[in-house]
């Protein structure tokens, strides 16, 4: 929304000093809406006191209020709206007692919220985005051309501040109104489902699809123009980077970028939230149908049992043979019966089960080198161990031997910076490069 130049304490003191207050019961709000509607039909935007009284009479009849005091109550309502700064009253000495009334910006804002902004229009949004795109392009071109301070204020800052920012605020307001409409649709769906869900299914589907379509139209229109708008904002931002005195333009561009990002991201998030609600409603309807179907069956069965002696009936049931489950999980439970007894050459023991045991044995055997202070040639030791195991386990055994060996000590030759020789450790081409461990 538009930024405020005053602080919170200043705004509070200002509102208290001017005694601002708004009180609009439903009949007064209806009167204000009637005034705005009639005012929109006039070219001059002005209304006389007699026309206001006529509008109040229509509202009074709609609320079934007495007509005897219509003049007094209309006068009180008009004075109250003037006091609340919803109407401006203009009088002249030549036409005493014949005042002219005009809606104030506050009155227009309230009536716009309830009348003009309630309907979403893709065409209106497209026109707004088209105007914004044109303004941003002209501002970006002016920013790249450069100029004095007056040039930046008139051709860059002013269009961004008083045209682009206001349209962004209008689009943001449209999204917030869509949020309210979504909540109203949710309330309508809840009321329909509470009354008669069978008759409400078609109405719920219509409300859900219409709202989903409106949200998607809004988001598609925004995303189609979003990249172009961001590109022009970046052009302006790049043009201000070399000017230290244009911080006010740079700050405004940053605010506009944030607004545009917020508008587009909230549009997508709103769609995602509505999709979740749509699924929830459909799940509720399916559950209601299942529950109602079971309830009808139980009711019919209970009624048949109660009237059995008057209307006998027979119950026929079928019991099919059970299907055997041949999945792999079931076969694993009786593995011996299926595969039989394996020969010794095919028996397999998972390596992880003996890893700790093997590591302990190797650690104990290698500890002899440390105890006797005998140099440990890693290539020879690994080759000796690998000769005791099948080829499939060579890699794992070699890793265990090397891990245990390096824990015992280091090779002084490592500090010379010279590489060690490669030594074969099995008959299949595996080699290791390591100096002799001689310092424990």
From Swiss-Prot:
Query: Cellular component per GO?
Result: condensin complex; cytoplasm; nucleoid
Q: Does the keyword S-adenosyl-L-methionine apply?
A: no
Main localization of the protein described in the UniProt heading: cytoplasm
Gene Ontology MF annotations: calcium ion binding
Q: Does the keyword Metal-binding apply?
A: no
Question: Which CDD domains does the entry mention?
Answer: MukF_C, MukF_N
Q: Which GO terms describe its biological process?
A: cell division; chromosome condensation; chromosome segregation; DNA replication
User: Where does this polypeptide localize?
Assistant: Cytoplasm, Nucleoid
UniProt keyword annotations, A-Z: Calcium, Cell cycle, Cell division, Chromosome partition, Cytoplasm, DNA condensation
Region called Leucine-zipper, residue ranges: 208-236
What quaternary arrangement does the UniProt entry report? Interacts, and probably forms a ternary complex, with MukE and MukB via its C-terminal region. The complex formation is stimulated by calcium or magnesium. It is required for an interaction between MukE and MukB.
Could you say which protein family the record assigns here? Belongs to the MukF family.
Its function, per the record, reads: Involved in chromosome condensation, segregation and cell cycle progression. May participate in facilitating chromosome segregation by condensation DNA from both sides of a centrally located replisome during cell division. Not required for mini-F plasmid partitioning. Probably acts via its interaction with MukB and MukE. Overexpression results in anucleate cells. It has a calcium binding activity.
Question: Protein name, please?
Answer: Chromosome partition protein MukF
């Amino acid at each position: 929304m538009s930024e405020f130049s005053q602080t919170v304490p200043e705004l509070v003191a200002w509102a208290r000093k001017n005694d601002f207050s708004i009180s609009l019961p439903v009949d007064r709000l209806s009167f204000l809406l009637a005034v705005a509607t009639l005012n929109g039909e006039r070219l001059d935007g002005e209304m006389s006191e007699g026309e206001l009284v006529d509008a109040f009479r229509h509202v009074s009849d709609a609320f079934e209020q007495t007509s005897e005091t219509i003049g007094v109550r209309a006068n009180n309502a008009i004075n109250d709206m003037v006091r609340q700064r919803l109407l401006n009253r203009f009088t002249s000495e030549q036409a005493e007692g014949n005042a002219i009334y005009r809606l104030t910006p506050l009155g227009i804002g309230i009536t716009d919220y309830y009348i003009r902004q309630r309907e979403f229009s893709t065409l209106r949004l497209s026109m707004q985005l088209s105007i914004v795109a044109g303004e941003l392009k002209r501002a970006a071109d002016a920013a790249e051309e450069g100029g004095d301070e007056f040039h930046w204020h008139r051709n860059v800052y002013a269009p961004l501040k008083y045209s682009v920012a206001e349209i962004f605020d209008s689009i943001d307001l449209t999204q917030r109104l869509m949020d309210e409409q979504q909540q109203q649709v949710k309330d309508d769906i809840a009321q329909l489902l509470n009354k008669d869900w069978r008759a409400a299914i078609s109405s719920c589907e219509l409300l859900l699809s219409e709202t989903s379509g409106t949200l998607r139209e809004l988001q598609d229109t925004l995303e189609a123009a979003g990249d172009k708008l961001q590109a022009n904002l970046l052009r302006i931002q790049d043009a201000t980077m070399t000017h230290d005195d244009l911080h006010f333009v740079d700050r405004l561009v940053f605010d506009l970028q944030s607004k545009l990002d917020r508008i587009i991201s909230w549009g997508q998030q709103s769609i995602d939230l509505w999709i979740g609600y749509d699924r929830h409603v459909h799940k509720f309807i399916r559950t209601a149908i299942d529950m109602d179907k079971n309830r009808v069956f139980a009711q019919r069965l209970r009624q048949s049992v109660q009237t059995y002696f008057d209307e006998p009936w027979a119950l026929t049931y079928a019991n099919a043979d059970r299907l055997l489950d041949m999945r792999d999980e079931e076969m694993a439970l009786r593995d011996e019966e299926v595969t039989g007894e394996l020969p010794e050459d095919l028996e397999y023991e998972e390596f992880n089960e003996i890893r700790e045991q093997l590591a302990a044995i190797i650690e104990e055997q290698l500890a002899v080198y440390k105890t006797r202070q005998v140099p440990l040639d890693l290539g020879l030791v690994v080759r000796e161990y690998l000769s005791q195991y099948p080829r499939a386990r060579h890699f794992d055994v070699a890793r265990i031997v090397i891990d245990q060996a390096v824990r015992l000590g280091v090779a002084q030759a490592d500090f010379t910076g010279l590489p060690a020789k490669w030594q074969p450790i099995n008959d299949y081409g595996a080699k290791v490069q390591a100096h002799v461990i001689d310092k424990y």
